[in-house]
């Protein structure tokens, strides 16, 4: 079963092709042009390098958010377009869970993905990796820096951070409350998206292109501004 996965929810753009949960190829870009300019060309190069046609894909997986509003929309629209052509199933994956999956190996640990939500906030969630299993400890949320710091201190153990909010998170927590994470594990990986999607597919958790919905956690700035004007 071939799985195509993509993540464009932050600065990093990543696409991957898997056979079940085995990685065949992954391309990642951490800078340069916008995702609207790079995601489709990256996908074309990925598939061509593996001599695979888009119509051969069985499952389309996407990091559904939270993250950059524009990036989330681009990823969802790309996958919806591909899946709609041949009525293939779609699977949406939490960006934060995919980030945590990057660190789901080795010894038991607490993993906290942090993404820049602006306005003094992170998009974040907490996960435990215990006895070879990644366990979600709370829902995805938008959380102020102050509340984030308070909750991590209350955990009573040092944590591993990942995501584009890594530097800000480490600055808040310092070495007292957090470990250093290798740089290559801090960023989005479409392979992590595919791994989660494969498990969800086996559990019967899938949807159609029409039903796939991004996760924003809060309204885009333009929509918030519009509502404020309406109240006024």
Each model region followed by its residue ranges:
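Residues at secondary-structure transition points
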Residues: 30-38, 69-73, 77, 94, ...
């Amino acid at each position: 079963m071939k799985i195509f996965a993509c993540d464009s929810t932050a600065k990093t753009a990543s696409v991957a092709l898997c056979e079940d949960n085995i990685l065949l190829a992954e391309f990642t870009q951490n800078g340069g042009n916008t995702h609207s300019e790079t995601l489709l060309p990256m996908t074309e190069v990925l598939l061509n390098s593996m001599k695979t046609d888009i119509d051969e894909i069985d499952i389309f997986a996407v990091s559904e958010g939270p993250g950059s509003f524009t990036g989330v929309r681009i990823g969802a629209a790309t996958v919806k377009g591909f899946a709609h052509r041949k009525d293939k199933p779609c699977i949406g994956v939490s960006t934060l869970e995919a980030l945590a999956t990057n660190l789901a190996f080795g010894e038991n640990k607490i993993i906290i993905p942090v993404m820049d939500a602006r306005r003094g906030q992170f998009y974040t969630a907490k996960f435990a990796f215990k006895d070879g299993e990644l366990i979600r400890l709370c829902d995805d949320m938008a959380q102020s820096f102050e509340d984030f710091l308070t909750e991590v201190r209350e955990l009573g153990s040092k944590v591993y951070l990942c995501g584009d909010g890594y530097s800000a998170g480490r600055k808040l927590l310092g070495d007292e409350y957090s470990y250093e994470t290798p740089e290559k594990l801090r960023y989005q990986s479409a392979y992590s998206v595919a791994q989660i999607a494969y498990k969800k597919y086996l559990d019967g958790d899938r949807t159609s292109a029409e039903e796939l919905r991004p996760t924003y956690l809060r309204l885009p700035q333009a929509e918030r501004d519009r509502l404020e004007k309406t109240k006024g």
